[in-house]
Amino acid sequence: MPKENPVIAFLNKMADLILLNLIFLLCCIPVVTIGPAITALYAVSLRSVRYGDGYVIQTFFRSFKQNFKQSFVVGMIGLLFVCLLVIDLFFWRNVGPAFMSVFMTVVSVCVGYLVFIVFLWLFPVIAKLENPLRVQIKNAAAMAVAHFFPYTLFVSVIVLAAGYMAYTSIITDVLLLLMGFALLAYVCSFFFYKVFACLLYTSPSPRDTR
């Protein structure tokens, strides 16, 4: 079987990322479906890293449906935590006693980072593993800590850097709307895949689509 032309392969991958990004953004419009949309985004990205195929629409909506309940709960918890963290930081920086401001701000940021790295793993874990939610959270936390160097650290830096660039650059915002979220998930999936490969893929199986 002849190899696919590298240029054609690249263009196909870009088309898949643009399509995936569009579907992801549309599914995020209701806000409450952000969690299921992120899980489905990783389901497609992880499959693409492993198999190199497309199947964007089929894989996305299958994962969106199968993992909706857990992802919805996780998404709501994540949104609630972000709101509480913002309120907490605002209080200690603007309302709280001056002598406690710096200390509590540092504590809040550290706690926020710990929760953040667990959530980084949680959506891919839901996309790949079938377990009760408490087990999913436990597994995500264990992976985040056990693989902090280098995978968790690299992924968190990539995501935070992308967030900072989006905050400071209009060009980055445009790229995110075009294909950025899908590209970000795809890049991060290379790191996640290395861990999942050790846990799940002891032998290649084309039936493993989750």
Model-derived regions: residue spans:
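Helix-adjacent hinge/juxtasegments
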Residues: 71-114
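Structural signal for membrane-spanning alpha-helices in multi-pass inner-membrane proteins
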Residues: 24, 28, 85-90, 162-166, ...
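Short, Lys/Arg-rich, polar N-terminal cytosolic tail immediately upstream
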Residues: 1-6
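Interfacial loop at the N-terminal end of multi-pass membrane proteins
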Residues: 38-66
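Selective recognition of hydrophobic, aromatic-rich stretches within alpha-helical transmembrane segments
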Residues: 24-46, 99-131, 172-199
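Single conserved hydrophobic/aromatic residue that forms the stacking wall/gate
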Residues: 201-210
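Interfacial aromatic "cap" segments that immediately flank transmembrane helices
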Residues: 12-22, 63-80, 125-163
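Membrane-helix interface segments
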Residues: 13, 56, 68, 97-102, ...
